[in-house]
Amino acid sequence: MAKDYPYGEGKVKWVNTDWLADHLDDENLMRLDVQPNVHDYIKEHIPGAVYMNEGLLRIPLRGLPAQYVSADVMELLFRRVGLRPEIPVVVYTGVGPFSGWGNGLEQTMMAYTLVRFGHDNVHVLDGGIDKWKAEERPLTQTFPEVEESDFNAVDRSEYRVEYDEFRALKDRGDVIVLDARPGNVYEGQGPWIKAGHIPGAVNVPWKSFMDPDNPRLLKSDEEIQAIIEEHEITPDKTVICSCGTGREATNEFILFKWYLDYP
């Protein structure tokens, strides 16, 4: 069955390349390029897109790497790139034409972060800029004119779980913990001091849900549902998404929360 785009439930929705092409001249639609390196953006980007690197979102905190910056800092970043809560923003990434890298998680990291810190209308470009380019759609090297905004950021606690809360929840019968890391890392071959996984966590690598040739493109709904049924993930359970640094988990968090409409 054909989808009506934007597709999804709530604060994050998915759009396809046809939809974005039809809305490319819409002044009330922001495009946010999150390719891995600024030189990827400089070399080529979707017309009208502003660049923002996911590396700005997290820094060390008291020795712990990859901790989100405060809401005050995030607010400054959001204002500088011109984000406005009333205007939808399409987020996309791809294999950078300069860096030659990009695994697709750039756009799920950014989508999750935007919502966590106060945006309510985020669109993810299914297939990313790679699909856009494969279809020979327009690209540019021109930078758009951007006015700073007055975005007010807040760190929404409902989109994260703290360590002590997690320990209290993880063994409950109505809770399922997903481990989004690759299988070999789940099995103990990762770089961590304590290799392995959280006892009871179910390993569903984030790439399981994505097209094998383009990890920015979701598999069909039928394939996604088959994976969910295989692992007995049901909407009557609280799903906690986990990984190593919180990056891989964003792919499954936005998928279950807003694509599949899990509570």
Give residue spans per PLM region.
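Short cysteine clusters
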Residues: C243
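Thiolate-centered catalytic microenvironments shared by cysteine-dependent enzyme domains
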Residues: A2-Y7, Y68-A168, Q189, R247-P263
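Positively charged, proline/Ser/Thr-rich regional signature most characteristic
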Residues: D4-E86, G94-F98, L169-P235
